[in-house]
Amino acid sequence: MRKHWIDNLRWVTVLLVLFYHVIYFYNNKGVFGGIGGFGPYPEYPQYQDVVMYILYPWFMPLLFLLAGISARYALDKYDGKSWFRARTRKLLVPATIGLFVFHWMVGYFNTVVASRQGVFEGIPGFVKYGIMAVSGIGPLWFIQDLWLFSLLLLLIRKLDAKDRFYQACGKLGLAPLILLGILFFLGEYTLVRQPRPESLDGLYNLYKPVFYLIPFLMGYFVFANDAVQEKLGKVWIPLLGCAAVSGIALTVTTFGQDNTSPQNLASPLNCLINFFGR
């Protein structure tokens, strides 16, 4: 039976992701990728940027967790090969072919500033097109990560062919479930703390493969269990309260800083809102 709450939670989260990017595009807190704010901080505080501090720590981990839950339910119905074939068709194909057919338009807007500075002067049109296509990768990193995790999941499932680990996770009490948040804290430390300019460090920090693999596997092995969902459903109000308090504390103590920096993401408060926010 399809669980519509997963679909509802997913589309609401996607809308919040879009809302976040509207705010982020005009932020003045030093977050890379936007076009800049209405003036320098702190002369122009731009309090609407609070949205970035509240939403960024948890919405992408939540989407990966939901993807892990959905993968569990799908693999209960289909064999691994059929499921992965469908994943490849729905994820990898749009992330490659779609990059050159549609996302060059996103790349065009990403390169407007560079064009105004004369960076593309003398460069042939087909080369510009290639640059725009690659720079337009944008949200495709999510489905590229998801495809990779789907491949890894098939390998991991062979280690737990009889679902013993999955069944053990379903017996976890509330305290162990909350302590799983420590894994997020450890996952954030896999980021490159001081990314080097003109290297792949920034790209790695964007994809965060190790960090995002954690909620994906949590969704598959832990949160897909009906027993776990029932336990958390009974205490959702206190958990939501903890998330709200953590979010307020994080915003008050870090407002004005780059909320996407590895140092900020690895802070205990960030990890708390990351876990409780889901």
Predicted features, each with a name:
Residues 1-278:
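Alpha-helical transmembrane segments and their immediate juxtamembrane cytosolic regions
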